[in-house]
């Protein structure tokens, strides 16, 4: 049994977000450093999410969990992700650490769970599934090194590349959900990168 390296998986998501035109993502190490400074080992609720967003001065936070992990062929990767967005008109001032001693909604900018702005996506990518393999083939075209021994099949045998593929698909799904939530039109209703 192989343990999941959560930081490596999160880095795949950061990399994929950075490739979306118009989006910027803070480096994972900066987010982890901010969490350590706040005494957080994870983001367990919206209060913590909004506190972290204010500390980072970020517009949103992508949270996720790995739901399936098998790094041996046939590869299997599953994840659930969500984006928590800062509410319109929310307080963008840097977090005053004294506020952390007052755990009320008002002390974190008035955010509460009844006004949470979120979009979610989840999937399981199974290396035995015909649907997954077809989507993986479309994704790997032009991305694989043609001079490597495994070529495009590298995405079927290397968990790091398979996870990158999963991150791409999940983020595409998440962007489509977020666009629908915000009423932003997408070309053909899809959040696809232009080649």
Where are the regions a protein language model picked out?
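Short, low-complexity, polar/charged sequence segments that are solvent-exposed and flexible
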Residues: 8-14, 44-47, 81-85, 100
